């Protein structure tokens, strides 16, 4: 099944890719879309392939007239895997919140332009960052 009859997956992928470097096409499966942001490098002195990053990831799933999302904050480790972790440094937390809110705003605006809404998933009750008013 494509995302919606009015919005085929290929067109959505192009629109999502236009939002910036966040879309991870290789991790998008079926009707699920995966985005992430490596916002803060843990240690810039390490070789690039060994660096870890604080950041966030968000997954979208289509419904009839909207997309639902879940997101996490955490560590992107040197193995290339995300691990949900509590962010202890307030400056890092602020940077993650700022980049996540900015992406969420642009994503919601893009979806509105194609007459879709963006809503938290029903089972996503523990949101670490308030994304909208």
Swiss-Prot record:
GO CC annotation terms, alphabetical: cytoplasm
Pfam family membership, one: Crl
Keyword Membrane: no
GO biological process: positive regulation of DNA-templated transcription
Parts of the chain that traverse the membrane: none
Keywords noted in UniProt: Activator, Cytoplasm, Transcription, Transcription regulation
Segments of this protein annotated with the region Essential for activity: 99-122
Subcellular locations according to the entry: Cytoplasm
Family per similarity comment: Belongs to the Crl family.
Cited function: Binds to the sigma-S subunit of RNA polymerase, activating expression of sigma-S-regulated genes. Stimulates RNA polymerase holoenzyme formation and may bind to several other sigma factors, such as sigma-70 and sigma-32.
Name of the protein in question: Sigma factor-binding protein Crl
Species annotation: Yersinia enterocolitica serotype O:8 / biotype 1B (strain NCTC 13174 / 8081)
């Amino acid at each position: 099944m494509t995302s919606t009859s009015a919005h085929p997956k290929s067109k959505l992928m192009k629109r999502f890719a236009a939002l910036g470097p966040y879309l991870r096409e290789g991790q998008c499966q079926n009707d699920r879309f995966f985005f992430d942001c490596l916002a803060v490098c843990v240690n810039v002195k390490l070789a690039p392939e060994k660096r870890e990053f604080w950041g966030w990831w968000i997954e979208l799933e289509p419904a009839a007239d909207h997309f639902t999302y879940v997101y996490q904050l955490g560590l992107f480790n040197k193995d290339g895997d995300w691990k949900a972790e509590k962010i202890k440094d307030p400056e890092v937390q602020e940077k993650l919140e700022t980049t996540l809110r900015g992406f969420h705003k642009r994503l919601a605006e893009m979806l509105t332009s194609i007459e879709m809404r963006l809503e938290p998933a029903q089972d996503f009750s523990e949101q670490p960052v308030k994304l909208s008013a």
